[in-house]
């Protein structure tokens, strides 16, 4: 019924905006443009159905009033329900409805549901049905004509109108941001227009074309609130809605006004950008036009600063005004008002001098604005005046611009200040000079710029002796006076045009005149207070007035900026005309253009070019006579000197005087070449060359690095060689300014030897041509030799050596002699020379077996330096040898192509060898003597480590155990070799050790592990052979897998448990003959020393000393006993009861007996069945077994002899693969990528924090100008090696903050894009601990700072580009880096150099030599770790002064100022420190461990008990086969890396008691057996149980006059594989433990004494370095002590017997220790084994012993 009524009264029905909706919703991810025809039909059908079913809602459903709005609601539209918007989008009507709103007088409701009004419901497109009124209406809401008073159309034409006007309207987009509202309104208005509602939209005057109906208002209200959510509305829109929430029309009206305003703004900007002015219109009109535009833009929020405005104005100047572009472009602080002053001046002079020369004003403008300094272009010095004192600056040349006023200055008391007015000065005749408009104000508004001029005022200057003025308008009685000489404050002449009188008319009607000079070459009109004083006028700056001596006030003084001014309105104008002023100075040069000005005008061309151009009339408008060339001869343009600076010209033949002045070998040239990248570690990366000036004799020496000691060794060698071989002394060495030559060490060496260093100037390579050309020649020869021979690149220096030998023997075209002949040497015997790379066969006199071939193919390199042999490269052994036992391959009889060097590595067949050769050995000389040694210890490349790059990924495939066995020969017939050379293979096998030296010794095959690093002592130490208490090695491992042993002999490795081996025949040490004697224990040695050593007999007996110390040296200043007590007094040693002197403790009596059974341990060691076998027999046994295995594997048949398989199974490949491809293991990643942190992060709160951190990082990058934002580059145009990938990484810091960092992928950075010689230094951990210890003893304040984004302060020198992150959508573009982005290889070094330079130059610091990142001055010590700074000072103000200086340049944050006298807590480089000044310091990591250890997924406290020690003695790591698949192996290795990584970090920070256990397990990272993992879990469990332990320091006694530095040393003899010994050292400063070290001895020791000597010798260098650091930081005297529990070691160190030691290695170490004791005041004392706290560094100890040795210093 009701629906029928609706159809009958369709002319007042509500529209189909709510009725014609479908029941289907459009998915949010649907393409809004993809609307198929089928969907259109569905929409139409649904619309029809909905129209037919539309009903009204009963009146009882009216909604209550909205409680959120207190103001009354409009009668026409009801308030919404439950908030500012309707809950169901339903509009109701109260009783005050207008007619036509409802049927039969009942309230009607329009059903609007949220989904119906949603933009997603109405499919956008041409078929969209929103908004469309129902067909019963007759027509959509059409816009009636203004004449029509009806709102709706006539029903008679409903059908036709509906047909003609029906269309589908795309809804407006959703508003998503307040900033997008202006653009959204435009689309909304367009939406209303398309909906036939254009008539209700307000016009420009704010009124619509027609009145809006109620239905339209309802529609307007609902659509606005749906598509413009309240949270995204601008503030001004919310303000309107808060008054009337339905007033949408007001919002539309104001939005249209803003659009019109935006249009006006755009027009103003276009006008301002296209300004044109040539003087055809008055300057006032032009100024008014420009200022109005700028004011309008500023009022609308578009700020146009002075610089931009001036540039736009000057760009539009033309004609005479164009000249201002060149005179004003350098003034950075110029204002618009200043520029218009110049425009006005030119315009007025144009008007006043129309009959004069056209360019006359231009000349004056030139002199005024561009030639202030006359012939001297140096910028005049500005002397600032004290605003509270009298101006006392001297007369100065004016700056090049005037200054305008602004509007924020207070007025003065004596004169009212009015707004600037302009009144032209009326002159008596047409020749009167017009000087512009006079300023009438006596007080002005001013800015704070001290260099601004106050227009219309004179500057009061107490330092000026004469008054100077620029304008002739006020000069009376002008006359010429060329004899006046005036200079400015910089002693530069100021040209004077005229002299006259300056007449004043003051407030009291008195008139006064003073002398004045006229010159246009000043910036300010200067009024001399001295000349005013001569006429009884003084300036009172307290009252700010000019007054007479009787107190009569004459005129007010204005304070503007830093100066004081008096108004020109008190000056009387004159009637001087333009010609009068011009003709005052009769000098011809004053009417000419000054040459400096012409020089700048003509683009700084040289004088000759300018003169020639003027003479030939190539430049018009003036000729050569118009230029004053009086100063052109001696004129120097500073800009030209800077911009055109060039290197000095080198005169040909300039070095001839050196050749005539010096004898041979007195003048040398030297230079360093390198580095050569991608080479093995054992191959040299550099070489240093020397060339004699006179003879041109050349020497080359290989270098592995450019360190000071390496360079010094070469210099020592070359000087000794020249002195001994040529009986000459080097007088001068010429070199460049590289740091390797300019360092202090080399400088002192040259000075000591009386050699003068001659350095080249910076960046002047031509001055170093001799050395540079030699390096280029040798490098060309090297490339040619390698190309011709086909030898691998790691032999590059051999090619250099060969070329040097040949070049020294070739004659010079100039001298017709060779360098050898000039040096007096015989010519080169070419019969002894072979072509580089000549194939040869080398005799092997000691093959692996009797059936192996005796000849080894090789390639000749160059003659030996040290013998009559030849250096030959053996590819099969990957080494070079020095031998004469070789035969040259020649002719067609060569069968070298049948040798298979290494099928796994070499891809080229040996038949490809080229390079012809000629044999120089006769046929009867082929058989060489067998008694010559094949090897030579002198060869610099005797061991070749293979190429470290591109390791073979052996983890992905099985490797046969027979990979390293001798290769078999080819079974097929091979082609015979022609007479051309055989080309050697270019690649070498990266998996064969460099230690395989000919003759091939049979070695144990223990696989070594390299590059496992720990942060020990603040640095990096390599961790070596694993073992807690290792058992003997299986004798079945291949010898080829002993691939890294040499690496570990030269590193600070960590080793394993100690066992007391006795009764082993050894050679005695010290002063005895080499005889075999029984091994004795330390106690027996101690007894023997007591009976034999007189110094020990003289010392107090042991029962009278609680420490049982044996002194070594008797000091002259302090008694031995006092020194001993002083050193021992404060050490944290355990308390033990005194023992009988005849009873000596056995430090190993608590150790359990060694297991007698033998396991499959691949690492060998102390688990052997016969612990007392001699060393020689033990080694021979291993070698013999290895040989048997290798022979058996050569003939092994896996099919027929499966049951007899040798002891190594295929599963062992997991350990082998890990050793060979250790670099393939990915590092632990603790950060998140962008997609992990933001895109796919389901934790909303964390995601928001990461987003905030991301925006903060982006803003910081833009603030620091990290890259060039002016230009983006195409990827195709840039060299790929200069392109660096970039990415964002995210992590959560320890303090809970979320951090984002934009980093470069330095891990894939090309080597050519950075200097590998640069180092990124950080403070050494020992330096930090030393500084903290000294701070405690000296009551220092400790201040902690942080520099934000430190790397970004360092500029980058190289040309590098980065790819923007992928999510930024710039995949095809590149941006150029300007700053050192985090992640780049050179960023750390660049930042170090930047902050180092700033600390030295600006903060007055100096870096402590030998201790990078430690800076000091007389008051402050600074430790620098990247962006963290720790400041130590006795005076807190000294720290604050440094902080103030740092903040001037860097964003410096004070983390902890350290000013409290109570306990202060720090977090310094991972250490949690509690410090109470003058009392104690505690160092720990409890909070960090509490957070990190649970994240390691270690089963903590599995048995519910706490561990008392990290390990127990008697535990052995089994080295059985590791039966594990690939994936599980990698997973466990990754787990071990995490666990040991954390343990190493903690151990080397402060838990020195755990170092032995940490290092032992670290060596098993690549052998993650179940036993190793369990032991690692036990170590982590102990760290968890003792996480609250701290390293405790107490302040030293204030009465102590000295600093005491002590090293406690210990060694465990022979408890490592190959009978290596474990050594350990602990370092203490004033009784406080500051560091520790546990490592494996690099040499095999044959007794406990040798092991102890090795341990002590390892501690001495660091002891000396720490001593130097302490003396630099604290000037107190220092006592160095060394404690050991080996009396025999003490006896050897103390002995004066100089007989030969057992071997040169330990003899050298012992003699070094003697020198330290005798020459460096090192005191050595004995300490009981049970008190030796270094014992924890060398072996696992029982719980009781472990606690006893550690509980005094860590608890």
UniProtKB/Swiss-Prot annotation:
Residues the record marks as active site: 461
The family database entries (PANTHER family) matched by this protein are listed as: TRANSPOSASE, PUTATIVE-RELATED, TRANSPOSON TY4-P GAG-POL POLYPROTEIN
Q: Any idea which positions bind Mg(2+) 2?
A: 1346, 1427-1428
- The UniProt entry lists the main location of this chain as cytoplasm
Concerning PTM, the database record says: Initially, virus-like particles (VLPs) are composed of the structural unprocessed proteins Gag and Gag-Pol, and also contain the host initiator methionine tRNA (tRNA(i)-Met) which serves as a primer for minus-strand DNA synthesis, and a dimer of genomic Ty RNA. Processing of the polyproteins occurs within the particle and proceeds by an ordered pathway, called maturation. First, the protease (PR) is released by autocatalytic cleavage of the Gag-Pol polyprotein yielding capsid protein p45 and a Pol-p154 precursor protein.
Q: Which GO terms describe its biological process?
A: DNA integration; DNA recombination; proteolysis; transposition; viral translational frameshifting
Short motif Bipartite nuclear localization signal, span: 1178-1212
One GO location term (cellular component)? nucleus
List where Polar residues composition bias occurs: 48-60, 127-152, 1005-1015, 1054-1082, 1101-1111
Q: Where is the composition biased (Basic and acidic residues)?
A: 1038-1053
As its record notes, the protein acts as a catalyst of: DNA(n) + a 2'-deoxyribonucleoside 5'-triphosphate = DNA(n+1) + diphosphate; Endonucleolytic cleavage to 5'-phosphomonoester
Q: List locations, semicolon-separated.
A: Cytoplasm; Nucleus
Gene from which the chain derives = TY1B-ML2
* Summary of the function given for this chain in its UniProt record: Capsid protein (CA) is the structural component of the virus-like particle (VLP), forming the shell that encapsulates the retrotransposons dimeric RNA genome. The particles are assembled from trimer-clustered units and there are holes in the capsid shells that allow for the diffusion of macromolecules. CA also has nucleocapsid-like chaperone activity, promoting primer tRNA(i)-Met annealing to the multipartite primer-binding site (PBS), dimerization of Ty1 RNA and initiation of reverse transcription.
Q: Where does this protein have coiled-coil stretches?
A: none
What is the protein's name according to its record?
Answer: Transposon Ty1-ML2 Gag-Pol polyprotein
| Region of interest (RNA-binding), ranges | 299-401
